């Protein structure tokens, strides 16, 4: 599955010391920290999803899915008690040396399986009912057969290393352009909301896998604080 395009973010840098000298201002010195909060859109490649229980064992191949962005409003995006409702990104970073930061991040996305799509299904269902049987062919994912989503969070918790490279800095230090590149590892902890046949709905948090990620970006700093 592919993710994530960050479309807007707020970033706050904090300095750990102060001195009066002629050296240019830097927001990436050793010991500095930052906090980032933003929102994202996510796009997913096709996935293979396996289901296994006491009386079923099957796989769905090349399943299509989409994200579910929350409609923009002050209530949904800026009220403090609603900040985890939209698809969000949160990150804290600490500069372990100049221009090199170690960060901890939380990416909250949403994953919704496309309903009524046709996929390849292989396996068997032994539960009595209209879907009992062996499968090795096309299957339409109707709502009475399966609904599957991570709308309470397809959550990616990760650590990253980021390298910053200064491109331009104005003489008054009020405008800085920096490139950045980074990579990290993490694990997926979604809350899956799934309903299969007439089984009870499942909606528990669980560790669902691990991931690696990389990024490149451009950072614009408009003020020193």
Residues covered by each model-derived region:
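Short glycine/proline- and aromatic-enriched beta-strand/turn motifs that initiate or cap beta-hairpins
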Residues: 20-94
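Outer-membrane beta-barrel transmembrane domain signature
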Residues: 48-66, 149-152, 162-225
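Short sequence motifs at beta-strands and strand-loop junctions characteristic
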Residues: 27-29, 76, 80-86, 149-156, ...
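Extracytoplasmic loops and strand-loop junctions of Gram-negative outer membrane beta-barrel proteins
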Residues: 69-77, 139-147, 196-202
């Amino acid at each position: 599955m592919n993710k994530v395009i960050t479309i807007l973010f707020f970033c706050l840098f904090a300095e750990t010391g102060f001195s009066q000298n002629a050296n240019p201002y830097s927001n990436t010195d050793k010991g500095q920290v930052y906090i980032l909060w933003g929102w994202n859109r996510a796009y997913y490649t096709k996935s293979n999803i396996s289901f296994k229980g006491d009386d079923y064992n099957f796989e769905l191949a090349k399943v299509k899915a989409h994200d579910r962005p929350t409609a923009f409003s002050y209530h949904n995006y800026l009220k403090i008690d609603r900040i985890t409702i939209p698809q969000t990104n949160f990150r804290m970073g600490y500069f372990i040396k100049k221009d090199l930061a170690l960060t901890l991040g939380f990416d909250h996305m949403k994953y919704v399986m496309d309903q009524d799509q046709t996929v390849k299904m292989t396996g068997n269902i032994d539960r009595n009912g209209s879907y009992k049987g062996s499968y090795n062919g096309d299957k339409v994912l109707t709502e009475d057969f399966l609904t599957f989503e991570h709308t309470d969070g397809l959550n990616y918790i990760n650590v990253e290393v980021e390298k910053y490279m200064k491109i331009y800095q104005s003489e008054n230090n009020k405008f800085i352009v920096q490139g950045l590149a980074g990579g990290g590892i993490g694990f997926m902890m979604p809350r899956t909301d799934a309903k299969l046949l007439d089984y009870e709905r499942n909606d528990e948090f669980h560790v669902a896998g691990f991931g690696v990620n990389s990024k490149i970006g451009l950072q614009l700093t408009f003020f020193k604080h």
